[in-house]
Curated annotation (Swiss-Prot):
Main function: Broad-specificity nucleoside monophosphate (NMP) kinase that catalyzes the reversible transfer of the terminal phosphate group between nucleoside triphosphates and monophosphates. Also has ATPase activity. Involved in the late cytoplasmic maturation steps of the 40S ribosomal particles, specifically 18S rRNA maturation. While NMP activity is not required for ribosome maturation, ATPase activity is. Associates transiently with small ribosomal subunit protein uS11. ATP hydrolysis breaks the interaction with uS11.
Gene Ontology cellular component list: Cajal body; cytoplasm; nucleoplasm
SUPFAM superfamilies: P-loop containing nucleoside triphosphate hydrolases
Originating species: Oryctolagus cuniculus (Rabbit)
Protein's UniProt name: Adenylate kinase isoenzyme 6
Family statement: Belongs to the adenylate kinase family. AK6 subfamily.
Residues holding ATP: 13, 15-18, 109, 148
GO biological process, one term: rRNA processing
A GO MF term: adenylate kinase activity
Keyword field: ATP-binding, Cytoplasm, Kinase, Nucleotide-binding, Nucleus, Ribosome biogenesis, rRNA processing, Transferase
């Protein structure tokens, strides 16, 4: 049976991981957090002194994920999306969060003032939504609100319906 690949993207702190893990547990699809994958496989290409974090080796991430993506049934969670092959994803969800809510979430994570402000600016200017629109066909890119628990439930329900329909349409 063919299964869809889903990309969850958006500014850090919008709820990609929470949504992705819950969606995987309810749908049976496999969840991959690219940050965790990179950490476990040490898929890095240097260190960013300004942001105090490792730099992702995008080519190695693609090599690591390619077979799984070809097999299908994968939910990928990452705050960037322009380096993934377009053919990988059947649908892309960009999570969006109000800046006041996002600020509190990032502050709780202990982000530096610069990192915090840069991520808030990223959300204000819809940087990741625009990146998704430039990287994938417009009709597969969807924005989802991610501010409160009720929206999480609505998003899960909406995506589960989409998965069910996709499976029907591609396995008859």
């Amino acid at each position: 049976m063919r299964l869809p690949n889903i990309l969850l993207t958006g500014t850090p702190g919008v709820g990609k991981t929470t949504l992705g893990k819950e969606l995987a547990s309810r749908s049976g699809l496999k969840y991959v957090n690219v940050g965790d994958l990179a950490r476990e496989g040490e898929l890095y290409d240097g260190f960013d002194e300004e942001y105090n974090c490792p730099i992702l080796d995008e080519d190695r991430v693609i090599d690591e994920l390619d077979t799984q993506m070809r097999d299908g049934g994968v939910i990928v969670d990452y705050h960037g999306c322009d380096f993934f092959p377009e053919r990988w994803f059947h649908i892309v969800f960009v999570l969006r969060t109000e800046t006041s809510v996002l600020y509190k979430r990032l502050e709780t994570r202990g982000y530096s003032e610069k990192k915090l402000n840069d991520n808030i600016q990223c959300e204000i200017f819809q940087v990741l939504y625009e990146e998704a629109m430039e990287s994938y066909k417009e009709e597969i890119v969807h924005q989802l609100p991610s501010n409160k628990p009720e929206e999480l439930e609505e998003n899960i329900s909406q995506i589960l319906k989409w998965i069910e329909q996709w499976i029907k349409d591609h396995n008859s």
